[in-house]
Amino acid sequence: MLSMKRRGAARLAAAVVASGLVAAGAIATAGTAAADDTTPTHGGATATLGGLKTFDQAVVHNDGGDQRVGAGLFEMAVDNGGTLQTYCIDIHNPTQQQAKYQEVPWSASSLHNNGDAGKIRWILQNSYPQVNDLAALASKAGAGNLTEKTAAAGTQVAIWRFSDHVKVDAVDPAAEKLADYLEKSAQNLGEPKASLTLDPPAVSGKSGSKLGPVTVHTNADSVTISPAAGAPAGVKIVGKDGKPVTSAAEGTQLFFDVPKGAADGSTSLTAQAATKVPVGRAFTGIGEHAKSQTQILAGSSESTVSAAATVSWKKQGAIPAITAEKNCAKGGVDVTAANKGDEAFRFQLSGKDYEIAPGKSQTVTVPVAEDQPYNITIKGEGGFKKSFSGVLDCKTAGSGGGKPSSKPSPASVGGSTGGDKGGDLAETGSSNATPMIAGIAVVLVVVGGGAVFFLRKKKTGTA
């Protein structure tokens, strides 16, 4: 196992200092002319794909013939420190070289409508690398002798049978017996919780009060809370008791304490922790790598995870907080506008007019085609403007009849195959340095005014 505890605190401290996070995917703004373009995010781990590292061969049986593919464990380097191991859950879609990934809930991935998603999690928890006693694993499966490569291949094959529902066999007989055992034994388990999220990621309200709450959800023992650099004087991050907060844990409620008479403005906070990402969390490509093969977590070292939340305040008038997140079940992006002001918030979204009364919120689901780049813009009174961009990737490529990739990882086919002697992550000896990904170059298509919307209305919680 990679021992990260001695370096975890140092990594986290460095990450807090280095991080210039703005709450991507959420904005709360009091300005009369705010314009931002963000990608919906969920918080948690972000990482760069290093390639297929521990693998053997498998054969996919298609109507057009058989195709041999690599099957096994991928490796990712976590931003600001940490290493992840993952399996593929999108066999027909290749990975992209040095693709950037983010941790997401199943609802924002191809698992959203997969009734076998829980069986995949069972396989992950009951096979390699979580089970690293290969002799014991082989005995259970009646597989003879297993190596790290064949154990990884058999595990991947079993996962594909549930993630993509394809006919696929491992080439190695022992790996095939392991795959059959895992497939027959798998039970449906629940979705694992996120490593770190903040809910909601944007709040708003009148100055002279505590604005929030923003609730911390995490599996980490402790989370470091940091205000944005250059936060307005007098604005504090506090708990329910009104005392300043610099650390938090699961369930902690955070508030932005804005002094009375403060000039209209906005700021944000960053939450960061060092923890192991739960096995079974989904990872999807982001930015220019949004269409890269979807992955699912098999093992994690202690890794840096983060989330952010924004706040805005005014003395009077409409005070909106806007958030967006993918909704794979409805095939679109949920845009939620909450208004904590004393006047209605009026805005346009894709050619339609909306009005949110004080103390209310409304969610609009904007339909987006699968694999379609989108640029969704909200325009409000006084020059208010907010845009969300990305690519909707909610289905396995097999849904469109694509052929499986013979090279699941063009980035790196090969590498080390280390063994884990007692924990979550097989030792790979990878570097913690994470390559920086250059800017996003995606052609964005504005969602037109002719789109159909699904609406939900609800009261916002009290501050």
Report the location of each language-model feature:
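Secretory targeting and sorting signals
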Residues: 1-36, 435-459
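Extracellular Ser/Thr-rich, low-complexity/disordered mucin-like segments
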Residues: 2-6, 404-444, 460-463
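Short loop/turn segments at connectors of secondary-structure elements within structured domains
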Residues: 29, 221, 265, 341-343
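Short, surface-exposed polybasic-aromatic patches that bind anionic ligands, especially phosphate groups
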Residues: 36-166, 172-188
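Short, ordered beta-strand-loop transition motifs
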Residues: 64-68, 81, 203-207, 248, ...
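Acidic/charged, solvent-exposed loop-and-adjacent secondary-structure segments enriched in E/D, K/R, S/T
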Residues: 167-319
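Membrane-proximal extracellular "stem/stalk" segments
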Residues: 261, 276-423
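Conserved, compact domain cores that house catalytic/ligand-binding motifs in diverse enzymes
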Residues: 337-359, 427-463
